[in-house]
Amino acid sequence: MSTQTRYPEATIEADREVPIIRITRDFRGTPAQLMKAHTDPELFVRWVGPDSISSRIVEWDVRNGGSWRYVSSRGDDEFAFRGCFHTVSDDTIVQTFTWEGMPDQVALETLHFEDLGDGTTRLHAQSLCDSFEARDGWLSSGMEVGVNEGYAKLDGLLGEL
């Protein structure tokens, strides 16, 4: 699969020992720009998810202990997601992530923005799922399409910041 990005698609890996998904991708932008794109609700909805959906923010309280919820739509179908921000710092976000279609499956996500020193930032994302079955369900869902199409949109957005 190919997208129009300056960088290769995201690397998506599953850990064999623990139910973790790791995603790594480089972006042309600073850690501060990537943090802003992940925490500013008006920017976030412009890039999150595949091209075939649109998203709206329902709740967005970016602070340690704050919560968030957004709804993505495709035609008449809606998909709601929610979580809590546990840590928000200059280069790291730790949050929970739940798709409301399976509310008992909660993942703990860590996003870290590594400054590579040449105007490039490497995103390290890790999702610790509550079971191997949940993790494998994510991986078999076609999530890579949403990840890569969303990150391609994020590439374009970073050029505006």
Question: What is each model feature region?
Answer:
Residues R22-I23, E42-A80:
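Short beta-edge strand/loop motif at the mouth of beta-sheet-based domains
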Residues L34, F44, W68, F85, ...:
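Hydrophobic pocket/interface hotspot
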Residues P31-A32, R63, H86-D91, F113-R122:
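A short, structured loop/turn motif at beta-sheet edges
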Residues I20, V94, T98-N148:
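Beta-strand/loop substructures that line and gate deep hydrophobic ligand-binding cavities in soluble
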Residues V18-T24, P31, S55, S67, ...:
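Intrinsic-disorder/low-complexity, polar/charged segments enriched in Ser/Thr/Lys/Arg/Asp/Glu/Gln
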Residues I57, L158-L161:
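Short, highly charged C-terminal tails/helix-capping segments
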Residues T24-R25, I57-W60, F81-H86, F97, ...:
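Hydrophobic/aromatic beta-strand elements that line small-molecule binding cavities or substrate pockets
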